[in-house]
């Protein structure tokens, strides 16, 4: 059993930052605690809510009749609460309480349609929308007029991959991307192939980086667009954006980058890096879901066919009424990303180093990514645990929220195509787990995760015949396996 104390105060205090929290969040915490499989009591004098929740301790019986028991790591619930520890920030981030506070006023007082130009309700909302647009542009040194609001990075990637080639299709019929892009980029590229475009998929090396010479060789006279992800969502590898942008500019080719995992987390200057289009997602930077943006360069101008038409909003590139609460939250999240970038960077690097060292101290583990810190985002740590299935490990880690790859493909049983592109075999690709560290991750949580992973990897390997053979000194590569 472990006990959690949730104080009914107007603030939540982490060991590294003080956050304002609205009463809405307090009620949410209390509701979450009361609906979990736990025992809840309250103390009227101290204003404390006590929640006791059991931890499962699975036990299995191998064929020889012996018993293997999994001893749960000790969890200090006064720090962690009753829900699993969250280490899946590449899938989504929690909304920063200050972002929520900013959004709430747009559900009550500032409810005007920002496109209504005949009265004060529309004017005041439009003013706030433009303020948010400015905050978002400022992070990447762009002009606010170059920010086009969308529903998220998937729509933005579709807009770039489909919109630019369609506009120039009479003279340009070739697109270049990489084998490790997000699914929405790869699927959009395949869609354009069906429309008659040629697609070149650049390979990556064992650390996930493209070869710039491969890019130069792939360029043709009719190449219209190069799309390369800034930070990979599965392994955290940072591509050399400045060098890619320079190559594209010299060849008069448009350069698009999916920066959903990079925006606000690594330095990006669209002018210095010669980026023409850039995809942004709000919910990756502690903002609300359902809102994103596309940076579209104005000088030299980038032309594209819109994929959503109608009222002509957003410079005619993305029609539809904007959602002011989401836009305001997005803008506030962007402002905070720039304001706290130095602190976030230091905090994430510290915890990432600790987590990575702790995980790689386990025998037969492998880090998936780039060992050069210049090309590796520290908040994404992808590790393969040999001789066990990643899905089995996830099931044994019910008290930690993790994933075995992209959230968009996590339901698939197929091994990661990203790790395959790096040259990993099926076994290592199947045994990979992605750990995400963010602004609200604490050192105590990382300590617990390292201890829990050590225990449960050991537990699962004791049931693995392959692990038993390796421990017995058998070289698995020397065995001639036969199928029946």
Curated annotation (Swiss-Prot):
<dbReference type="InterPro" id="IPR015422">
    <property type="entry name" value="PyrdxlP-dep_Trfase_small"/>
</dbReference>
<keyword id="KW-0479">Metal-binding</keyword>
<feature type="modified residue" description="N6-(pyridoxal phosphate)lysine">
    <location>
        <position position="284"/>
    </location>
</feature>
<feature type="binding site">
    <location>
        <position position="233"/>
    </location>
    <ligand>
        <name>pyridoxal 5'-phosphate</name>
    </ligand>
</feature>
<dbReference type="GO" id="GO:0044571">
    <property type="term" value="P:[2Fe-2S] cluster assembly"/>
</dbReference>
<dbReference type="Pfam" id="PF00266">
    <property type="entry name" value="Aminotran_5"/>
</dbReference>
<comment type="similarity">
    <text>Belongs to the class-V pyridoxal-phosphate-dependent aminotransferase family. NifS/IscS subfamily.</text>
</comment>
<keyword id="KW-0819">tRNA processing</keyword>
<feature type="binding site">
    <location>
        <begin position="153"/>
        <end position="154"/>
    </location>
    <ligand>
        <name>pyridoxal 5'-phosphate</name>
    </ligand>
</feature>
<comment type="function">
    <text>Catalyzes the removal of elemental sulfur from cysteine to produce alanine. It supplies the inorganic sulfur for iron-sulfur (Fe-S) clusters. Plays a role in both tRNA-processing and mitochondrial metabolism. Involved in the 2-thio-modification of both 5-carboxymethylaminomethyl-2-thiouridine in mitochondrial tRNAs and 5-methoxycarbonylmethyl-2-thiouridine (mcm5s2U) in cytoplasmic tRNAs.</text>
</comment>
<dbReference type="InterPro" id="IPR015421">
    <property type="entry name" value="PyrdxlP-dep_Trfase_major"/>
</dbReference>
<keyword id="KW-0663">Pyridoxal phosphate</keyword>
<feature type="compositionally biased region" description="Low complexity">
    <location>
        <begin position="29"/>
        <end position="42"/>
    </location>
</feature>
<dbReference type="GO" id="GO:0031071">
    <property type="term" value="F:cysteine desulfurase activity"/>
</dbReference>
<dbReference type="GO" id="GO:0008033">
    <property type="term" value="P:tRNA processing"/>
</dbReference>
<feature type="binding site">
    <location>
        <position position="261"/>
    </location>
    <ligand>
        <name>pyridoxal 5'-phosphate</name>
    </ligand>
</feature>
<dbReference type="GO" id="GO:0005634">
    <property type="term" value="C:nucleus"/>
</dbReference>
<dbReference type="InterPro" id="IPR000192">
    <property type="entry name" value="Aminotrans_V_dom"/>
</dbReference>
<feature type="binding site">
    <location>
        <begin position="281"/>
        <end position="283"/>
    </location>
    <ligand>
        <name>pyridoxal 5'-phosphate</name>
    </ligand>
</feature>
<dbReference type="InterPro" id="IPR020578">
    <property type="entry name" value="Aminotrans_V_PyrdxlP_BS"/>
</dbReference>
<feature type="region of interest" description="Disordered">
    <location>
        <begin position="29"/>
        <end position="69"/>
    </location>
</feature>
<feature type="active site" description="Cysteine persulfide intermediate">
    <location>
        <position position="408"/>
    </location>
</feature>
<keyword id="KW-0496">Mitochondrion</keyword>
<keyword id="KW-0809">Transit peptide</keyword>
<keyword id="KW-0408">Iron</keyword>
<dbReference type="InterPro" id="IPR015424">
    <property type="entry name" value="PyrdxlP-dep_Trfase"/>
</dbReference>
<dbReference type="GO" id="GO:0030170">
    <property type="term" value="F:pyridoxal phosphate binding"/>
</dbReference>
<feature type="binding site">
    <location>
        <position position="321"/>
    </location>
    <ligand>
        <name>pyridoxal 5'-phosphate</name>
    </ligand>
</feature>
<dbReference type="GO" id="GO:0005739">
    <property type="term" value="C:mitochondrion"/>
</dbReference>
<dbReference type="GO" id="GO:0051536">
    <property type="term" value="F:iron-sulfur cluster binding"/>
</dbReference>
<keyword id="KW-0808">Transferase</keyword>
<keyword id="KW-0411">Iron-sulfur</keyword>
<dbReference type="InterPro" id="IPR010240">
    <property type="entry name" value="Cys_deSase_IscS"/>
</dbReference>
<feature type="binding site" description="via persulfide group">
    <location>
        <position position="408"/>
    </location>
    <ligand>
        <name>[2Fe-2S] cluster</name>
    </ligand>
</feature>
<protein>
    <recommendedName>
        <fullName>Cysteine desulfurase, mitochondrial</fullName>
        <ecNumber>2.8.1.7</ecNumber>
    </recommendedName>
</protein>
<dbReference type="GO" id="GO:0046872">
    <property type="term" value="F:metal ion binding"/>
</dbReference>
<dbReference type="GO" id="GO:1990221">
    <property type="term" value="C:L-cysteine desulfurase complex"/>
</dbReference>
């Amino acid at each position: 059993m472990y006990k959690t104390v949730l104080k009914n105060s107007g603030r939540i205090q982490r060991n590294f930052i003080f956050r304002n929290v609205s009463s809405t969040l307090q009620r949410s915490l209390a509701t979450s605690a009361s609906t979990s499989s736990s025992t809840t009591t309250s103390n009227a004098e101290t204003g404390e809510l006590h929640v006791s929740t059991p931890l499962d301790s699975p036990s299995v019986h191998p064929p020889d009749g012996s018993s293997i028991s999994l001893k749960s790591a000790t969890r200090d619930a006064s720090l962690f609460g009753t829900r699993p520890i969250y280490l899946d920030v590449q899938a989504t981030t929690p909304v920063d309480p200050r972002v929520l506070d900013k959004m709430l006023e747009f559900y009550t007082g500032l409810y005007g349609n920002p496109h209504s130009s005949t009265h004060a309700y529309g004017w005041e909302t439009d003013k706030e929308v433009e303020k948010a647009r400015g905050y978002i542009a400022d992070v990447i040194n762009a002009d606010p007029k170059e920010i086009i609001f969308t529903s998220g990075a998937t729509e933005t990637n579709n807009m770039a991959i489909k919109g630019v080639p369609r506009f120039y299709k009479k003279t340009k019929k070739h697109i270049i991307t990489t084998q490790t892009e997000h699914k929405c980029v790869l699927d959009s590229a395949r869609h354009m192939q069906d429309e008659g475009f040629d697609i070149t998929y650049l390979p990556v090396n064992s650390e996930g980086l493209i070869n710039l010479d491969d890019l130069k060789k792939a360029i043709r006279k009719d190449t219209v667009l190069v799309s390369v992800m800034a930070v990979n969502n599965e392994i955290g590898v940072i591509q050399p954006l400045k060098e890619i942008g320079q190559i594209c500019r010299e060849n008069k080719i448009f350069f698009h980058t999916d920066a959903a995992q990079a925006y606000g987390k690594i330095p990006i200057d669209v002018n210095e890096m010669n980026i023409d289009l850039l995809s942004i997602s709000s919910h990756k930077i502690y903002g609300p879901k359902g809102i994103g943006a596309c940076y579209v360069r104005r000088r030299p101008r980038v032309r594209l066919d819109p994929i959503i038409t109608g009222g002509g909003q957003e410079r005619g590139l993305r029609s539809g009424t904007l959602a002011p609460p989401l836009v305001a939250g997005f803008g506030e999240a962007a402002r905070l990303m720039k304001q706290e970038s130095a602190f976030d960077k230091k905090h994430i690097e510290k915890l990432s180093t600790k987590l990575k060292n702790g995980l790689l101290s386990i025998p037969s583990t492998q880090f998936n990514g780039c060992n050069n810190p210049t090309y590796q985002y520290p908040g994404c740590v992808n590790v393969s645990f040999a001789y066990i299935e990643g899905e089995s490990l996830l099931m044994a880690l019910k008290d930690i929220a993790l994933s075995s790859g992209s959230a968009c493909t996590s339901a698939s049983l197929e091994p990661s195509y990203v790790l395959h592109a790096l040259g990993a075999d099926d076994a290592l690709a199947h045994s990979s787990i992605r750990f995400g560290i963010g602004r609200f991750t604490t050192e105590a949580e990382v300590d617990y995760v390292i201890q829990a992973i050590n225990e449960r990897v050991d537990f699962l390997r004791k049931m693995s015949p392959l692990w038993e053979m390796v421990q017995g000194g058998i070289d698995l590569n020397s065995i001639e396996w036969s199928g029946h």
